[in-house]
């Protein structure tokens, strides 16, 4: 009966004992490791029942300050360490090579393969070797070789057997970059959202279409790119961009600061200078109005109903041209009455030739 209750288990942390039951053959070839009984594991059955559940197979025997059994800490599914969850994991693990805290998965050297030299760690645009011409005989592409053709492991059925083989609706094709219909993601005219360069191409390209569909697809693609360029040009002209305007920190100077006082002081000087200039101009204009001009309206008979269109610099030649008869007797001018110009290098005042001749 004791042999039926004994269980044969593999070596574990429990203190296994060897079975010494005699057999008919050589006992050395039938050595078995028997699991200990319940009495050997724990003499307290209540504690054994408590350990079942979370520590059913591997009992947790750590105790806290109150003497209760401590539960196991949560285990992270990212780094397989206890003490935190996956959302709070501080470690970065590459999904390609498995390195921890070294690089991200998109920067793994094993995942980046150059199509020019077939080496790992860099793209075709950063290849240090001389450029060589590549051609794929499967999809007739010039951006990758036959061994790296995406059509090998990316095969899509665009039509069923019952569908018409001569027609193809390009509105069922959607772009993975901009989300619009009518073109593939590799042929999108918008800015690429992914930072991974698309130098090698992918299966989402018009080059992977059948020969009878390529011409019609690229004709529509040309019209789409033309409309996209026009729309982009219109958006650039009518778009309000905050970066086009410089940051003005004058509006954010707090009263009481040094910059604020300096600017207010400078503004006060400028304002006082402007007020002084304006007062001088008003004084000069008032003096000029007080002086009686020979060409003032007092010397003429100006009618309100009839307007005579004359040039302001034209001098009246006769008494019929709104001129009084006694004008010549009241006013007479000679050369000295006219204002003199600025002095020249010899100290003489430069006068106009017309003034020297007495004409005005």
From Swiss-Prot:
Keywords: Cytoplasm, Metal-binding, Nucleus, Phosphoprotein, Repeat, Zinc, Zinc-finger. Residues 274-286, 349-360 have a biased composition (Low complexity). GO terms for molecular function: RNA binding; zinc ion binding. Residues 317-333 have a biased composition (Polar residues). It comes from the Eukaryota. Its main location: cytoplasm. One of its GO terms (cellular component) is nucleolus. GO terms for biological process: nuclear mRNA surveillance of mRNA 3'-end processing; nuclear polyadenylation-dependent CUT catabolic process; nuclear polyadenylation-dependent rRNA catabolic process; nuclear polyadenylation-dependent snoRNA catabolic process; nuclear polyadenylation-dependent snRNA catabolic process; polyadenylation-dependent RNA catabolic process; RNA fragment catabolic process; TRAMP-dependent tRNA surveillance pathway. This is Protein AIR1.
